[in-house]
Amino acid sequence: MAKALFFNFCISLLIIAILVSHEIIPTEARHLRTHRKSIKNSTLTVHEGAGGLRTGGGSVKTDISKEEHGVDEFRPTTPGNSPGIGH
């Protein structure tokens, strides 16, 4: 009787150990740093004025002719000829 009780106790202890260790997930990851190094600038330069900047002088084409932007170019294919995703 004592052997059966001891055996049942060991089996139940083993089952509990397996259930508890199953909840612990082993992870392999890099360690995150808690302290960051502060980077200090040795010199501080302030730019005054816009001496090197260009202002104006550019042109933008705003009108699109019908030859460049035709209606037939953007129509969807018919359902029978659709290549599908990834083809």
UniProtKB/Swiss-Prot annotation:
Sites bearing Hydroxyproline, chain numbering: 76, 79, 83
Proregion residues excised on maturation: 30-72
UniProt entry tagged with the keyword Iron: no
Compositional bias segments (type: Basic and acidic residues): 63-75
Post-translational modification: The mature small signaling peptide is generated by proteolytic processing of the longer precursor.
Region (Disordered): 41-87
Signal peptide: 1-29
Tissue: Expressed in lateral root primordia and in lateral roots excluding the meristem region. Also present in the aerial tissues, such as leaf petioles and the shoot apex region.
Keywords, in A-Z order: Apoplast, Developmental protein, Glycoprotein, Hormone, Hydroxylation, Secreted, Signal
Induction comment: Triggered by nitrogen depletion.
Segments passing through the bilayer: none
Subunit details: Interacts with CEP receptors (e.g. CEPR1 and CEPR2).
Family: Belongs to the C-terminally encoded plant signaling peptide (CEP) family.
Name of the molecule in the record: Precursor of CEP8
Organism: Arabidopsis thaliana (Mouse-ear cress)
